[in-house]
Structure formats: C-alpha cells, structure tokens
Amino acid sequence: MTTLAIDIGGTKLAAALIDNNLRISQRRELPTPASKTPDALREALKALVEPLRAEARQVAIASTGIIQEGMLLALNPHNLGGLLHFPLIQTLETIAGLPTLAVNDAQAAAWAEYHALPDDIRDMVFITVSTGVGGGVVCDGKLLTGKGGLAGHLGHTLADPHGPVCGCGRVGCVEAIASGRGMAAAARDDLAGCDAKTLFIRAGEGHQQARHLVSQSAQVIARMIADVKATTDCQCVVIGGSVGLAEGYLEQVRAFLMQEPAPYHVALNAARYRHDAGLLGAALLAQGDTL
C-alpha cells in the first residue's frame, strides 16, 4: 500500500510517496509559511499534497508539536505561532480524501531509526538536536507516545535550575541551553546574532566563545543521555538533527558521556535516515506498525 507521508517542520514542509518496502518517490518540499496562520498552512499543505494524493491510499503525518486528538499542540506555544489547536488530521483528510494518521516528528523519527537497528535491539532512544531538542522512546519494541502525546519530549527535562527561561515556561530546560536556538541566544559580543550553523563554523576556526557554546551543548546532551539511560536502561541512543549531526558534535557528546560513571554509559549512533526519518517513521506506523 502506498502512503503519502508528510513532514511538518518549523522551516519546511516535505511530502513523498512511500511504498511497503520503504522506497521513497516524488519527494517534494515547500517552506513552512512564515505567517504561521491556519489558512496559510492549509493552503501550503494543499499545494504540497495535490500532485501526490491520487497515487496514495492513506496519509501519514510527522509534525512538530504534540498531536492530541488530531489537534496540533505544543509545550512551547511560541513555536507554533497561530497554529496552536490547528485541526491537523481533519485538514488532511479533507484535502486528500484519505484516512490519516499523525504523530510527533521526533517520535516518528525514533520509529524509523529503530527499524534500522539490529533485531536484538528492543530498547532505544532517539534524540534530535536541532532548532530545538526532541526525542522518541522505544521500549520492548514499542513506541511510547503517552496518552497526551508527551512521551519523548526530552528537551524539556532540567539541565540547569539557574539557566535561561525556556519557551515552555520552565527554567533551565535542556532545549533552552543545548539546542541551536539556545546556543544562538547565548552568543555574545562578535557572535551576537549568529545562528547555530555560523557558530559551528566559527568553532571550527578556533573561536573560543563558539567552541565553548558547542562544547556546552554537547555536555548538556551527554548528561541528559545519562539520565535517559538511568530512566529507560536503553541499549543504544541514536542522535539526529542539524546540530546533532554537525561535524565533530557526536564525538564531543560521546567524550562527555564517558566522563559519567560506567552504569550510565550507552552506545551512541548517528541517525541513519537523517531528513527522511520523520517521513519513513510515519509511513511505517500507517502501514501497520502500531503505537
């Protein structure tokens, strides 16, 4: 059965047709509407989906935010702008005329990355470090989403009780410090206003403040992974996202993790599917894998 998979992110929308063998075809991308209004997103999704829907039998969505009873919610409402409470499933069912499933994008990516691991791995955690920090947890071969869709939102665990205020309302969340946005917000002096990509470039050039910001992010993620190991006893952790997959970053996380006591050590892998993980994970769920 061919699935029309859609990935809704903060900066881009992606869609593709995916068959039962996880072959991707006719992949398309559009920028996420800057206005972040319901009408703008509805029109963008219609333009994205229209050329593909005739060949599909179902729709699977991986989206930023929390999916609750078909509605789009978020721990950090500022991330969604005017899209809070957007009727995501109903909108796509109307546009495509097909049965529709929706799941958080990091949870979907976790499910895809889990299927790329050896069969003896039954417990794993996926962490994406990008504009924000998200995650997904697979326990005994089952994806955990939680009744309210909150499971795996690891970026909103505590890193520093005296740290910056997070958009979710807590103080010192992992996301507020270790994410691309958090790193950029902490940049000062000649780095003020730089995005995470620029910070990595400057760090590679030896800029001391940039190197500190990257190192601080990696250390915070490593400590979070130690907490995750203690909580889930996972067999491995897979790291993805634009920051997580940046050159040299995973090696720094691994080095900091090795400074933790041995019981908190866990194998770290780079994400295999990269920008297609959300699409593939959502398709897998729609094609018969259950939540």
Curated annotation (Swiss-Prot):
Amino-acid positions noted as binding Zn(2+) in the UniProt annotation, renumbered to this chain: 156, 166, 168, 173
InterPro entries the record matches: ATPase_NBD (IPR043129), ManNAc_kinase_bac (IPR023945), ROK (IPR000600), ROK_cs (IPR049874)
The UniProt record lists the keyword Kinase: yes
Name of one Pfam family that matches: ROK
UniProt pathway: Amino-sugar metabolism; N-acetylneuraminate degradation; D-fructose 6-phosphate from N-acetylneuraminate: step 2/5
EC number(s) from the headed UniProt entry: 2.7.1.60
Chemical reaction(s) catalysed: an N-acyl-D-mannosamine + ATP = an N-acyl-D-mannosamine 6-phosphate + ADP + H(+)
Keyword terms of this UniProt record: ATP-binding, Carbohydrate metabolism, Kinase, Metal-binding, Nucleotide-binding, Transferase, Zinc
Family classification: Belongs to the ROK (NagC/XylR) family. NanK subfamily.
Subunit description: Homodimer.
Role summary: Catalyzes the phosphorylation of N-acetylmannosamine (ManNAc) to ManNAc-6-P.
Listed name of the protein: N-acetylmannosamine kinase
Classification lineage: Bacteria, Pseudomonadati, Pseudomonadota, Gammaproteobacteria, Enterobacterales
